[in-house]
């Protein structure tokens, strides 16, 4: 197969958080991107809610951080965020996990200039779509991938418009598979997965009801329910009187998703909130599996995996959607570097090496939290918690793309005491640039960056020469001469 002039640089299949982030970050770097999503629109359900500071740093790079924070309607209540293990909402609290946003912020605020956020997925995805399109990405909803052929020169894909039935062919230099945990692309390539597998089966219910007598207005708490009749979770959303309820079911006991009718879910919600006369408005009921998997390969020729296609993690800890956004950022800048001629194909191999390492940290942390809150029988068989700050801000990349200067095997460090060694996230340090106090984190974004002390003039001159040489290739190099910030008044 010879693709001399592909229709697009990158075809992204799947319009969730991972796929949309990939499209946004690629488009910002000038790549020609087509994203197809089989659903008719972005998510209509809250799904993955919450953005950790690392994700907010990436969103700042993508130019969407302020807009995401503006959609975060319940952010003002972060200080009251608590996680309770209870029999029913509003009942006796045998265990309360001291995990308030105040404590989480305390563990990370000295490591980053960006805040935590609580925006739900149905608010985030439209923002990503709008900004990706603004930068030139083409987004097609109600469009599915029916088949593809991959070779050394790229990919030829067949697409079907689900509205009209019309089929078309598109050629691309690369294909990014963001088609979810049951990724048809991954399976067609024979890429296997490893991990703990399916941990539990749940029914997810979105409903509306006035629960102000049980849940204080504006509450952002999350409840793990250990009721005599069921195990589940309950939490509010950013919309008034809209709530989420997840209940575990067990196929080995003959329980089936179809058993959870609106009537049955109403009965369980009444038990969960101790309100026998409640009449909830059931908006959605969906079955889903809690699982832990990591793909054995993240790249097969011109095809790369992101999001749940690459790794699946329990939602405990809230890191699944955040990790998918991180995948999108990493795969985008590496693809863009190869497309621009700044790097060779081997750089793409480092994407899977680095991504799988961080995903192992995320899965292990999520499993530890799951065991603590919902599955005590797993305690001792899963790794101990490292802590959110270390996993989110203290991870280290160890691929061949990193010029490591030591052989320390530890995959994380305390981000409150950053070492600045190669492979770790650039430390957050307040500096003065052009008379303005800003964070070193704010210096990064869509281009290569050189940080130099005031005496590093030769490095700055070299960066300027490189920028002139690469100017015709749309490559951008930024250098920053740093000085300590002035003393705070």
Swiss-Prot record:
Binding site residues for aklavinone: 317
Gene3D superfamilies linked: 3.40.30.120, D-Amino Acid Oxidase, subunit A, domain 2, FAD/NAD(P)-binding domain
Disruption phenotype: Cells lacking this gene do not produce epsilon-rhodomycinone and accumulate 11-deoxycarminomycin and 11-deoxydaunorubicin.
Pathway given in the UniProt record: Antibiotic biosynthesis; daunorubicin biosynthesis; Antibiotic biosynthesis; carminomycin biosynthesis; Antibiotic biosynthesis; rhodomycin biosynthesis; Antibiotic biosynthesis; doxorubicin biosynthesis
Catalytic residue positions: 224 (proton acceptor)
EC identifiers of the protein: 1.14.13.180
InterPro entries xref list: FAD-bd, FAD/NAD-bd_sf, RIFMO-like
Binding positions (FAD): 17-18, 37, 121, 145, 308
Keywords: Antibiotic biosynthesis, FAD, Flavoprotein, NAD, NADP, Nucleotide-binding, Oxidoreductase
Region (Disordered): 402-428
GO biological process: daunorubicin biosynthetic process; doxorubicin metabolic process
SUPFAM superfamilies assigned to the protein according to its UniProt record, in alphabetical order: FAD/NAD(P)-binding domain
Gene Ontology terms for molecular function: FAD binding; oxidoreductase activity, acting on paired donors, with incorporation or reduction of molecular oxygen, NAD(P)H as one donor, and incorporation of one atom of oxygen
Catalytic reaction annotation: aklavinone + NADPH + O2 + H(+) = epsilon-rhodomycinone + NADP(+) + H2O
Record note on quaternary structure: Monomer.
Protein family membership: Belongs to the PheA/TfdB FAD monooxygenase family.
Protein role: Involved in the biosynthesis of the anthracyclines carminomycin, rhodomycin, daunorubicin (daunomycin) and doxorubicin (adriamycin) which are aromatic polyketide antibiotics that exhibit high cytotoxicity and are widely applied in the chemotherapy of a variety of cancers.
Protein name per the record: Aklavinone 12-hydroxylase DnrF
Source species taxonomy: Bacteria, Bacillati, Actinomycetota, Actinomycetes, Kitasatosporales
């Amino acid at each position: 197969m010879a693709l001399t002039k592909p229709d697009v640089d990158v075809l992204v299949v799947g319009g969730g958080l991972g796929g949309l982030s990939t499209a946004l970050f690629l488009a910002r770097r000038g790549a020609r991107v087509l994203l197809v999503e089989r659903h008719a629109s972005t998510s209509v359900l809250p799904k993955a809610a919450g953005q950790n500071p690392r994700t907010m740093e990436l969103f700042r790079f993508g130019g969407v951080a302020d807009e995401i924070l503006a959609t975060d309607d319940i952010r003002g209540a972060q200080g009251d965020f608590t996680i309770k293990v209870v029999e029913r909402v509003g009942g006796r609290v045998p265990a309360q996990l001291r995990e308030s946003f105040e404590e989480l912020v305390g563990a990370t605020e000295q490591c980053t200039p960006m805040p935590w956020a609580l925006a739900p997925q149905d608010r985030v995805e439209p923002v990503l779509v709008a900004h990706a399109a603004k930068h030139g990405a083409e987004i097609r909803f109600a469009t599915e991938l029916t088949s593809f052929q991959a070779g050394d020169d790229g990919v030829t894909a067949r697409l079907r418009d689900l509205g009209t039935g019309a089929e078309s062919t598109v050629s691309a230099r690369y294909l990014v598979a963001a088609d979810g945990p049951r990724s048809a692309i991954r399976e067609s390539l024979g890429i296997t997965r490893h991990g703990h597998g399916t941990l539990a089966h749940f029914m997810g219910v979105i409903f509306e009801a006035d629960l102000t007598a049980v849940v204080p207005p504006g509450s952002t708490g999350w409840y793990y329910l250990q009721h005599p009749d069921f195990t589940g979770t309950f939490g509010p959303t950013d919309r008034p009187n809209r709530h989420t309820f997840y209940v575990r079911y067990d196929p080995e006991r003959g329980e089936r998703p179809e058993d959870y009718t609106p009537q049955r879910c109403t009965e369980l919600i009444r038990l969960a909130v101790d309100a026998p006369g409640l009449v909830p408005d059931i908006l959605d009921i969906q079955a889903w599996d809690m699982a832990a998997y990591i793909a054995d390969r993240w790249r097969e020729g011109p095809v790369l995996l992101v999001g749940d296609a690459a790794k699946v993690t329990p939602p405990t800890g809230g890191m699944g959607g955040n990790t998918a956004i991180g995948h999108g950022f990493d795969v985008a800048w590496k693809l863009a570097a190869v497309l621009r001629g700044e790097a060779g194909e081997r750089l793409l191999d480092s994407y899977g090496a680095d991504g799988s390492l961080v995903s192992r940290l995320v899965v292990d942390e999520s499993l530890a939290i799951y065991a603590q809150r919902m599955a005590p029988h797993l305690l001792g068989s899963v790794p101990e918690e490292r802590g959110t700050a270390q996993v989110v801000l203290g991870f280290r990349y160890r691929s061949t793309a990193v010029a490591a200067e030591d052989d320390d095997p530890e995959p994380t460090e305390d981000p409150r005491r950053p070492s600045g060694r190669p492979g770790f996230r650039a430390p957050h340090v307040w500096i003065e640039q052009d008379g303005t106090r800003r964070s070193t984190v704010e210096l990064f974004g869509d281009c290569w960056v050189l940080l130099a002390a005031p005496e590093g003039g030769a490095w700055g001159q070299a960066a300027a020469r490189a920028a002139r040489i690469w100017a015709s290739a749309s490559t951008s190099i930024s250098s920053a001469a740093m000085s300590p910030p002035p003393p705070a008044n």
